[in-house]
UniProtKB/Swiss-Prot annotation:
Originating organism: Photorhabdus laumondii subsp. laumondii (strain DSM 15139 / CIP 105565 / TT01) (Photorhabdus luminescens subsp. laumondii)
Region annotated Imidazoleglycerol-phosphate dehydratase, chain positions: 167-355
Upper taxonomic lineage: Bacteria, Pseudomonadati, Pseudomonadota, Gammaproteobacteria, Enterobacterales
Cofactors: Mg(2+); Zn(2+)
Protein name stated in the entry: Histidine biosynthesis bifunctional protein HisB
Gene name linked to the record: hisB
Primary location: cytoplasm
Signal peptide: none
Length: 355
């Protein structure tokens, strides 16, 4: 399973690097970098696995005997462990630059298995270090690098950057009938830009975003010269996929939502972002169209969305006006979605360990 990994340098990043000889070879030289413990705890809590990777010039030789290296290193590891911080691995290159080995950063020998065995979520893994060699290692690994500096980019700033919610997804779907581009920002409210070519459908999609508490851009070009079938269906598929991607690993979300708004129409919506697609839908309309939207396509839209989003969705409405009945379904779904995508913690809301 791909995991979010942090490859963290030791000297100058986790602990202070002595400016005189650049070796932590005595206990009195050991000092943790500011805020490193609370930052690592928060990063672990948000789902990152920690791997230490360090160059230790001449380790095990007369210039840097093991008996000088081990006491401060072991104490550092004990301190981290006592505070609940655990490293999956500690990767050490003991060679000097002139030995031209294959394991010294920024070369990738030490991290090869993470690149070849599918263990790493490359889009959400980072190298953190205080030297250019750390940034070059990140580049060689095909992941992002963060240049640690206690004043310019310290541990608090790194933690804030990596744990900040920014659930965004972009989906492009192109077929012979439609061309669709959708962007979804689940943690940002504001004006949405929606243009499907079907005015009433645009209004309904805006209801989802407005009542869902998020922002989206939807641009659709479809074969409306025939009818609205492909436009509505494919938009449902693309929007469902975008919502699923934006939710990511779903860690911390409420998962469930239920709403029963009562106005002229009585609409009911229940939602479970379960990974199991299913739709129960009950709505009757007097007319074939509401504005320029076919009423039969409303069910088709929600069915496409629920299957692409991999969620279980129950929708039901009663009322006397077709416009209000249709609108109540989209509003109810938006309000329910708002509940279900809200982040309240950092655990996965499933006893199975996966959604």
């Amino acid at each position: 399973m791909n995991q979010k990994l942090l490859f963290i340098d030791r000297d100058g990043t986790l602990i202070t690097e002595p400016p005189t000889d650049f070796q932590v070879d005595r206990l009195d030289k050991l000092a943790l970098e500011t805020e490193v413990i609370p930052a690592l705890l928060a990063l672990q809590k948000s789902g990152f696995r920690l791997i230490m990777i360090t160059n230790q010039d001449g380790l095990g030789t007369d210039s840097f005997p093991l008996e000088q290296f081990e006491p401060p290193h072991n104490l550092m590891m004990q301190i981290f462990s006592s505070q609940g911080i655990h490293f999956d691995e500690v990767l050490i290159c003991p060679h000097k630059p002139e030995e031209n080995c294959h394991c010294r950063k920024p070369k990738i020998k030490l991290v090869e298995k993470y690149l070849t065995e599918g263990l790493m979520d490359t889009a959400n893994s980072y190298v953190i270090g205080d030297r250019e060699t750390d940034l070059q290692l990140a580049k060689n690994m095909g992941i992002q690098g963060l240049h640690y500096h206690p004043k310019n980019l310290g541990w608090f700033a790194i933690c804030e950057q990596l744990t900040r919610q920014d659930r965004h997804a972009h989906v492009q779907r192109i077929t012979k009938e439609t061309s669709i581009n959708i962007d979804v920002w689940l943690d940002h409210e504001g004006s949405s830009d929606i243009n499907t070519g079907v005015g009433f459908f645009d209004h309904m999609l805006d209801q989802i975003a407005t009542h869902g508490g998020f922002r989206m851009h939807v641009q659709v070009k479809g074969d409306l010269c025939i009818d609205d079938h492909h436009t509505v269906e494919d938009t449902g598929l693309a929007l469902g996929e975008a919502l699923k991607l934006a939710l990511g690993d779903k860690r911390g979300i409420c998962r469930f939502g239920f709403v029963l708004p009562m106005d002229e129409c009585l609409a009911r919506c229940a939602l479970d972002i379960s990974g199991r697609p299913h739709l129960e839908y009950k709505a009757e309309f007097k007319h074939q169209r509401v504005g320029d939207l076919s009423t039969e396509m409303i069910e088709h839209f929600f069915r496409s969305l629920s299957y692409a989003m991999a969620c279980t969705l129950h929708l039901k409405t009663k009322g006397s006006n077709d416009h209000h009945r249709a609108e109540s379904l989209f509003k109810a779904f938006g309000r329910t979605l708002r509940q279900a995508i809200r982040v309240e913690g950092d655990t996965l809301p499933s006893s199975k360990g996966v959604l």
